[in-house]
Amino acid sequence: MARTKQTARKTVGGDINSRISEKRAKSDNSKNIDLKKVHRYKPGTVALREIRKYQKSTNLLIRKLPFQRLVRELAQDYKSDLRFQNSAVLALQEASESYLVNLFEDTNLCAIHAKRVTIMPKDIYLARRIRGEMIF
């Protein structure tokens, strides 16, 4: 029998799981196979779990090497060939993470005050303005 070329066909819409189950039902060798349903948590459950996890820990949230590269890149603007002790970079990282966490706490309070649960740039601007920081 001669081989023939097959042309590409578009699939007709519909749920992929229903099409798979129909194919399995038609085939002879897979009579009693059930598709396992993917487990999903309710929206917000994983977020709350992450919040609890990070509130318990005292670890740094930003990775050390990317932060170190950022510090060196910013220092190049002021003076070239600057060298940093490891403890100096660690102190900068501790201070910057503390600042960011406090800023996000204040930002979250601003969003809650506006009867929202999602923070927006205007919340950050308001938090910084209340703190008395300069906004560029």
Swiss-Prot record:
Keyword DNA-binding on entry: yes
Keyword annotations: Chromosome, DNA-binding, Nucleomorph, Nucleosome core
Annotated function: Core component of nucleosome. Nucleosomes wrap and compact DNA into chromatin, limiting DNA accessibility to the cellular machineries which require DNA as a template. Histones thereby play a central role in transcription regulation, DNA repair, DNA replication and chromosomal stability. DNA accessibility is regulated via a complex set of post-translational modifications of histones, also called histone code, and nucleosome remodeling.
This protein's name: Histone H3
Family listed: Belongs to the histone H3 family.
Keyword flag DNA-binding: yes
Subunit structure: The nucleosome is a histone octamer containing two molecules each of H2A, H2B, H3 and H4 assembled in one H3-H4 heterotetramer and two H2A-H2B heterodimers. The octamer wraps approximately 147 bp of DNA.
Gene3D superfamilies named among the record's database cross-references: Histone, subunit A
Gene Ontology MF: a single term: DNA binding
